[in-house]
A protein has these predicted regions:
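Short alpha-helical transmembrane segments in multi-pass integral membrane proteins
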Residues: 1-35, 94-159, 203-259, 315-380, ...
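Small-residue-rich hydrophobic transmembrane alpha-helices
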Residues: 65-126, 163-182, 289-353, 384-407, ...
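Helix-terminus/linker motif at the lipid-water interface of multi-pass membrane proteins
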Residues: 43, 47-66, 136-143, 199-206, ...
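Residue-level signal for short hydrophobic patches within transmembrane helices
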Residues: 24, 28-47, 51, 75-82, ...
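Short runs within selected transmembrane alpha-helices of multi-pass transporters and secretion channels
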Residues: 87, 155-174, 182-190, 211-226, ...
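Interfacial/gating helices of multi-pass transporter permease domains
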Residues: 56-77, 143-148, 208-209, 250-257, ...
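Transmembrane helical elements of multi-pass membrane transporters/channels
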Residues: 33-52, 155, 166, 189, ...
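Alpha-helical transmembrane segments and their lipid-water interface positions
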Residues: 45, 49-56, 80-87, 91, ...
Length: 464
């Protein structure tokens, strides 16, 4: 019978015997080859989120549209985003060990990560279900949408464990350079969600409850698929159910790198909760417009986040392999490509704002408010690029605390100060959303200065 040591040796030999293009191939090609599956995967993830909004908005009403977005989306992001941030520590650790061909350590990281997903899923389910009404009231959710919003968020958190397992499993696959299969799983999940949305919301008239049920069932499917692939692989990241447990030292390493990213996500979302509360105070029409904008706006975030994930894995594997020149070239290349993509998307969204909004609602007042928001924010997208790419780069080398502090001060604290001081002087949607480009600009400048002058990858003053 084959021993664990023999299995590890064979897995290592499998990796050594094949060329790892991420550390040897043409940089821009490798970034794009990794980027596109992540982009399309994120697109389908956003598509099934948008499907809820489109179907309930068109077939149930603007109150239902507000219920499945707005405050519920922000609260979901608060908890799920914290976990995804923590799980980024696993992605970084696995990518570095995989780049260094350390099979045993990859195995410890994989099984600890899945164990963490299971425990976190149970905890998040309990918190989400019990705290939902209180949290929605705290955010000044309008009374006419409080009931359906509570229903949606409670059903969502009852099935949240599928989301967490998928995100962790997809992160493991991306860490070893496989960004295609997470895409395939999301396509299957998205199509399932759309079919179930139509069946539950339109066919069975289940309203927001049907939309939530469709979402958690489709997420469960993606979780099953990603676990199936991890269990069938012959590579060093193979998952064996009997080995799923916490390794204390590995868990500490994962949390040490992932906790800053998790806290960063919480701080982002906490400041967004304050913003959402300010938006809620402007009425249901503005909440509906903001909800629809968040779905349109997701086009930008899925592009920039896909580049952020790509550069994290690229940097992690090349840093693990000791190829520092490729790290620096990769950062420059990724920044340039992201800038081009951002400008192109901004032009398209700005010029087709009305068409975008009419996908979600035909209410003239909601569309008018939404176009005003979009025309103000879209031209400022470019100010965020450096935050995503440089924070992803620094996470790739395990430097995550300083980026968290930069984001805390530059984004969260400054955003809160703006909302508490400027909005009372002029309580208007543009005053509220101005907090985004203001904080993006300040934080981007701080990231550039840290990366060039003070980080482990610093360019200025670096010994040659």
């Amino acid at each position: 019978m084959e021993t664990n040591t023999e299995k590890t040796q064979k897995q290592t030999e499998n990796v050594i015997g094949k060329e790892n293009k991420i550390v040897t191939g043409v940089i821009w090609q490798q970034l794009l080859l990794f980027f596109f599956p992540i982009l399309f995967g994120t697109f389908f993830q956003q598509l099934y989120n948008a499907a809820d909004a489109v179907i309930v908005g068109r077939f149930v009403g603007k109150e239902a549209l507000s219920a499945v977005g707005g405050g519920t989306g922000t609260l979901i992001q608060l908890l799920v985003g914290f976990f995804v941030g923590l799980s980024s520590g696993a992605t970084v650790i696995i990518s570095q060990y995989y780049g260094a061909k350390r099979a045993e350590m990859v195995g410890y990281a994989v099984h600890t990560s899945i164990a963490f997903s299971l425990v976190a899923g149970v905890g998040m389910m309990i918190v989400g279900v019990t705290a939902a009404p209180w949290a929605l009231r705290t955010m000044s959710t309008p009374e006419d949408i409080l009931g359906p919003a509570t229903t949606y968020i409670r059903i969502y958190f009852l099935g949240v464990i599928g989301n967490l397992i998928y995100n962790m499993g997809a992160g493991i696959l991306r860490a070893v350079g496989d960004s295609k299969r997470p895409l395939y799983f999301l396509i299957a999940s998205c199509l399932t969600n759309i079919v179930l949305d139509i069946a539950f919301v339109i066919g069975l008239h289940m309203g927001v409850a049907g939309a939530a049920l469709a979402t958690i069932l489709s997420q469960a499917l993606s979780a099953v698929l990603v676990l199936w692939v991890l269990m069938r692989t012959k590579d060093m990241h193979r998952l064996e159910l009997k080995k799923i447990r916490f390794d204390g030292r590995m868990f500490h390493r994962i949390i040490r790198i992932g906790l800053p990213a998790g806290l960063q996500s919480v701080m982002y979302t906490s400041s967004n909760i304050l913003i959402q509360s300010s938006v809620n105070a402007l009425g249901t029409d503005t909440v509906a417009a903001w909800t629809a904008y968040s779905k349109i706006d997701s086009l930008f975030w899925m592009i920039v986040n896909a580049f952020g994930i790509s550069i994290t894995t690229f940097v992690g594997q090349n840093y693990g392999a000791g190829k520092m020149d490729r790290v620096h070239k990769g950062v420059r290349t990724c920044m340039g490509i992201t800038a081009i993509a951002t400008v192109l998307l901004s032009v398209i969204l700005y010029n087709y704002a009305s068409i975008c909004y009419n996908l979600f609602t035909t209410d003239a007042q909601v569309v008018a408010i939404g176009e005003r928001i979009l025309h103000f924010l879209v031209p400022t997208y470019f100010t965020y690029i450096a935050i995503e790419i440089l924070s992803g780069t620094l996470r790739g080398i395990g430097d995550s605390w300083i980026p968290m502090i930069i984001c805390c001060l530059g984004v969260c604290v400054l955003r809160v100060v703006w909302i508490l001081t400027a909005v009372p002087l002029k309580n208007d949607i543009i005053t509220i959303v101005f907090s985004y480009p203001l904080t993006w600009t300040v934080t981007s400048i701080a990231f550039v200065v840290y990366y060039l002058f003070f980080s482990r990858l610093k360019i200025v003053g670096r010994k040659r």
